[in-house]
Swiss-Prot record:
Full protein name: UPF0270 protein ECA4061
Pfam families named in the record: UPF0270 (PF06794)
SUPFAM superfamilies referenced in this protein's UniProt entry, alphabetically: YehU-like (SSF118001)
Family statement drawn from the similarity comment of this UniProt entry: Belongs to the UPF0270 family.
Source organism of this protein record: Pectobacterium atrosepticum (strain SCRI 1043 / ATCC BAA-672)
Length: 78
């Protein structure tokens, strides 16, 4: 189930994004980016619709994933 990020308290959204960035350990190439920069990158992707917040009822977890990975019903494939 997609969770509308716009309806979350800004501090809650920041915490969710920060947790995701720390958990993912994404490689940003040759130049290391700060946590704040990575959080802003994800926030921009949420605003553009490139990624979405997804609640998994099966796993009872919240994740951020590319919109392109959702199935036709708008749900995560797990």
């Amino acid at each position: 189930m997609i969770i509308p990020w716009q309806q979350l308290d800004p501090e809650t959204l920041d915490s969710i994004i920060e947790s995701f960035v720390l958990r993912e350990g994404t490689d940003y190439g040759e130049q290391e980016r700060s946590l704040a920069q990575k959080v802003e990158d994800i926030r921009s992707q949420l605003q553009s619709g490139e990624v979405v917040l997804v609640w998994s009822e099966l796993h009872e977890t919240l994740n951020i994933m590319p919109r392109s990975q959702l199935n036709a019903g708008g749900h995560a494939p797990y």
